[in-house]
Design a protein with these regions (language model features):
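An acidic/histidine-cluster motif and surrounding catalytic segment
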Residues: 1-49, 53-129
Length: 129
């Protein structure tokens, strides 16, 4: 019942989505509720991680401070920085964003359903909510 109320408030129509299971809807809503809280608190961006995410080599370079993020992305723009992969083949294109810590930031040009780790900006949160 709480889940249905939250879906009705934050993501109308999600409960009727035919291709998502109840568990998938609940998982998505855990993200949406966090985005709403971040928006309410005026946070410029938030890092989101699933409880079973495995951190890779040099993850601390991306998580210990945010200077690299602020140097590469305008906090007032809509962006999502994916910090994980499911080893799913995707199409990408160059973004023009400078590499950091041996990692590139290409634009995602195809679908990728993983949400185990990402950074989402305030404007992107507003877009999805």
């Amino acid at each position: 019942e709480r889940l249905e109320r939250a879906m009705a408030e934050l993501v109308p129509g999600l409960s009727a989505h035919p291709y998502l299971s109840g568990v998938e809807k609940a998982c998505f809503m855990s993200h949406a509720v966090l985005w709403k809280q971040a928006l309410d608190e005026g946070v410029p961006y938030v890092a989101v991680f699933e409880d079973d995410v495995l951190f890779g080599k040099d993850a601390e370079k991306f998580l210990a401070e945010d200077t690299w993020l602020e140097e590469r992305f305008d906090k007032d723009s809509a962006f999502i920085v994916r910090l994980e992969t499911m080893f799913m083949h995707v199409l990408t294109s160059p973004s023009g964003v400078a590499d950091y810590g041996g990692r590139a930031f290409p634009l995602l040009e195809s679908e990728h359903c993983g949400t185990a780790g990402y950074i989402i900006s305030r404007k992107a949160m507003r877009f999805f909510l």
